[in-house]
Amino acid sequence: MSENALRLIASYVEEAAAARARFFTDHAELVDAAARTMAVALARGGKILFCGNGGSAADAQHLAAEFVNRFELERPPLPALALTTDSSALTAIGNDYGFDRVFAKQVQALAGPSDVVVGISTSGNSPNVLAALRAARDKGCVTVGLAGRNGAIVPLCDYALLVPSDRTAHIQEVHATIGHLLCKLVDHYLFEAVMELGPYLEDH
């Protein structure tokens, strides 16, 4: 391996680790609060809906699968779906109303006030994700956003999980870790530490 290749690897890994460390140093409590709210929603019979574009669409499908199947804990399936998978709905809505509405109309059709809608956008400005979160708010859903440093997504979210990086790849990598921790913490609250969730069920 060349010295240049080694330097590229070392630099990339160092930057990625720094972005991850900065995020979790500053936002661990916010991740926990979002996960706890998701657990409350599921305990009350709600579901989790995910949306995003490109790599974030893959994240949406990945996380929905972790809830429906399982993450690490052997437990019952949890209701979750990615709004990125129904090609007929996506193309019908896109054709008739435009790409900006492909998630929002699904939220209007499928979401209820006991649900949580998670929008994933590395820029924080994806129009169709923003529209989905607006629709979710109109339906009375809790909204969670995964994004980069900022963006129009922030005021639309009850929980805005913002990664302090300008590199899309590093933002996506931290989003994957956040997603796994949301799964792990939801499992913890629903199946390992049920008593910890009790007061929040009473408060909501």
Curated annotation (Swiss-Prot):
| Gene Ontology CC annotations of this record | cytoplasm
CDD domains to which the protein is assigned, alphabetical:
SIS_GmhA
Location in the cell reads:
Cytoplasm
Q: Does the keyword Isomerase apply?
A: yes
**Which residues make up the binding site for substrate?**
N53, G54, G55, E66, N95, D96, S121, T122, S123, S126, Q172
Q: Report the residue ranges that make up the SIS domain in this protein.
A: 38-199
Write down the superkingdom of origin: Bacteria
Q: Which UniProt keywords apply?
A: Carbohydrate metabolism, Cytoplasm, Isomerase, Metal-binding, Zinc
Q: Which principal EC class is assigned to this enzyme?
A: isomerase
> Where, in this chain's numbering, is Zn(2+) bound?
H62, E66, Q172, H180
Q: Does the keyword Secreted apply?
A: no
Kindly give the InterPro entries that the UniProt entry links to this protein.
Answer: GmhA/DiaA, Phosphoheptose_Isoase, SIS_dom, SIS_dom_sf, SIS_GmhA/DiaA_subfam
Q: Which GO terms describe its molecular function?
A: carbohydrate derivative binding; D-sedoheptulose 7-phosphate isomerase activity; zinc ion binding
| Swiss-Prot/TrEMBL catalytic activity | 2 D-sedoheptulose 7-phosphate = D-glycero-alpha-D-manno-heptose 7-phosphate + D-glycero-beta-D-manno-heptose 7-phosphate
Its assembly, as annotated, is: Homotetramer.
Q: What else is known?
A: The reaction produces a racemic mixture of D-glycero-alpha-D-manno-heptose 7-phosphate and D-glycero-beta-D-manno-heptose 7-phosphate.
Q: Which PANTHER family match?
A: DNAA INITIATOR-ASSOCIATING PROTEIN DIAA, SEDOHEPTULOSE 7-PHOSPHATE ISOMERASE / DNAA INITIATOR-ASSOCIATING FACTOR FOR REPLICATION INITIATION
Give the family this protein belongs to, as stated in its UniProt record.
Belongs to the SIS family. GmhA subfamily.
The record's function comment reads: Catalyzes the isomerization of sedoheptulose 7-phosphate in D-glycero-D-manno-heptose 7-phosphate.
The protein, known as: Phosphoheptose isomerase
